[in-house]
Amino acid sequence: MAVEEEGLRVFQSVRIKIGEAKNLPSYPGPNKMRDCYCTVNLDQEEVFRTKIVEKSLCPFYGEDFYCEIPRSFRHLSFYIFDRDVFRRDSIIGKVAIQKEDLQRYHNRDTWFQLQHVDADSEVQGKVHLELRLSEVITDTGVVCHKLAARIFECQGLPIVNGQCDPYATVTLAGPFRSEAKKTKVKKKTNNPQFDEVFYFEVTRPCSYSKKSHFDFEEEDVDKLEIRVDLWNASNLKFGDEFLGELRIPLHVLRYASSYEAWYFLQPRDNGSKSVKPDDLGSLRLNVVYTEDHVFSSEYYSPLRDLLLKSADVEPVSASAAHILGEVCRDKQEAAIPLVRLLLHYGRVVPFISAIASAEVKRTQDPNTIFRGNSLTSKCIDETMKLAGMHYLHVTLKPTIEEICQSHKSCEIDPVKLKDGENLENNMESLRQYVDRIFSVITKSGVSCPTVMCDIFFSLREAAAKRFQDDLDVRYTAVSSFIFLRFFAPAILSPNLFQLTPHHTDPQTSRTLTLISKTIQTLGSLSKSKSASFKESYMATFYEFFNEQKYADAVKNFLDLISSSGRRDPKSIEQPILLKEGFMIKRAQGRKRFGMKNFKKRWFRLTNHEFTYQKSKGDQPLCNIPIENILAVERLEEESFRMKNMFQVIQPERALYIQANNCVEAKDWIDILTKVSQCNQKRLTVFHPSAYLNGHWLCCRASSDTAIGCTPCTGGLPANIQLDIDGDRETERIYSLFNLYMGKLEKMQEACGSKSVYDGPEQEEYSTFIIDDPQETYRTLKQVIAGVGTLEQEHAQYRRNKFKKTRYGSQEHPIGDKSFQNYIRQQSEISTHSI
């Protein structure tokens, strides 16, 4: 989801690898071990949770998480919890990374010390406040000065133990006085609207009886302050919980009679600092945060056109897309946006065919074909992930789920056998699993996506043409991707391919490792099977599969998925599971009488229908055909005082649903919008609030059939497999070119050197593939010019934004140190440019 700003869209995403924790404090009991899990939070909102690792003080998680971030945030936080069967799970510690600091840890493993968690560490939110100093004449005719402190509202207050009933205290404090006032308690909201005014006498009336203007003494101004404290009203015996505070020196009114601003809440000055960070252990993380500022499409035309014609450039090494792979530090970094862009415009097959053919021509040994981490390999990997994910799920998921649920021991290493286990029984169980997975893979050829088949056909042709004497190379060229880089990794780590929600337990992980090794060897068609294994027990196990029928099945499968002109006979009309999970829904009012309460239900979306049931596997309680979905929109929080709600609008009624967090809500809205995009009766307007108590809360219309009062949001492309924003991917590629501008210029130098010097290649230029220096130089010149033009647009946007930025506004509250640094940096840039 993009945050709309003037003239551009802002996209945020984060990719996280949660590695492990170490040296957690021991449990205060005889066992001393803990059952721990880790959560990922945007500020305080949990968006992901790892599995529970039992009985460990150094738990290994090994889990990956990716999400598009649909809202603004200040901190990306990680909490380590200790599970408690009888009470609320307790927090051991947390890691909080400020949004502005995320780039410091970009894409590298980092150990973070766990910090203590208390009320002060959990402070978040902002307050809108106005101070006004006025002159008042008393009943006796004496002139005095009154301070009016108006607290309008708060936003984003922390939720304590699942609830937030906030109130504020406003205190005028000085060395010899402290006068406090209190607002009303606002129930069940962390965005309270107070709009209350409190009056304080600033000076003694006699002090100003002869003055007609504001001229109170310097020492009075410097020593007085307004303090606002936010509290959560609690019925617990421990008292109300602290939510945050702010302090405003009264000298802000020295030059004006009123002052109004937004403030970030801060922890108390005397907050708890008794626990040393080292006492709580540490957590290993790898975080990749990306923020893209995307202009309208016409800005990207020159660079986009240059990239899209890459397949037609001779030689392909002189193309803009190939050059991107040459200058990026990591080939995958280039492949991800490149493949998405080319897929979006239907140019991925010609480009991959061209770079694959060029790579094959440089390969000397058919046994090493496509075995390196080249741009070709990374582009094909990314294409298979994008286009083949549904194919992978249909093929493997049922068997993988059964393996995870059965918990059968399949250990065949005699050294690792547990007491009471039988080697022959384990070997037979493993053989059955391998046979089943091998069978479903080799029979799935007709379901392989067309774009993958077209790529495999080009690989097969290029390899057969290059190594005409090797009859097996046409198979190994394809199997090196479909088996070694697609099926085998998915079996080994199913959580990375969304086949399982979390990393599997150690025993299941071991079973999947053994299956993956065997499938990889079967698919490789290597001539010496036993030599493929370092372990003798694997060589012994493989004797079960040392029959010609297995090799024939692999070849038939590879022939089918790499045949010229083959098309997927399976129509998109077949039911495809797109998304499922628990959410909370409000009764739709299908019954004339009765309470419209909220209940937890298991939701399931296919390309045919949207259903919900009590639990996974139960019969559906409600079926909504896709053609009956007229719109999918967010529901305003004020409707039910519940966050992350959206509505699925049908001809007769709307289904109100609450997702578990903002990320999940965005995912459901996006996919539901996508599958219903082509419905002919889609609405153009809707009601953003609910119909309650005889009227719509948004427009106050009394009829429940009243036409909507707000335009529907823009839809997404109606493409079930891929949802790609071409402009966003071009912006990502621009960012990479801009980041590696030094390498682009170095590559230009290499082209010049090669054009005029025929001797041995200089070492600093040897890392570049330059087949045609003149053509490569021309492309580089165009790339640098296109990147420069876009950089000017970004610089102009930053200047315009800086001019309009007001410190203390709702978007940029006072108290944000990172924003103060931004102001200072932009001021320096502006001064330098002048």
Swiss-Prot record:
Domain annotation Ras-GAP: ranges: 346-561
InterPro entries to which the protein is assigned, alphabetical: C2_dom (IPR000008), C2_domain_sf (IPR035892), PH-like_dom_sf (IPR011993), PH_domain (IPR001849), Ras_GTPase (IPR039360), RASA3_PH (IPR037774), RasGAP_CS (IPR023152), RasGAP_dom (IPR001936)
Zinc finger (Btk-type): 679-715
Top-level taxon: Eukaryota
Domain PH, chain residue ranges per copy: 576-677
GO CC field: cytoplasmic side of plasma membrane
Residues bearing PTM Phosphotyrosine: 66
Location of N-acetylalanine modifications: 2
Function: Inhibitory regulator of the Ras-cyclic AMP pathway. Binds inositol tetrakisphosphate (IP4).
Protein name: Ras GTPase-activating protein 3
Source organism of this protein record: Rattus norvegicus
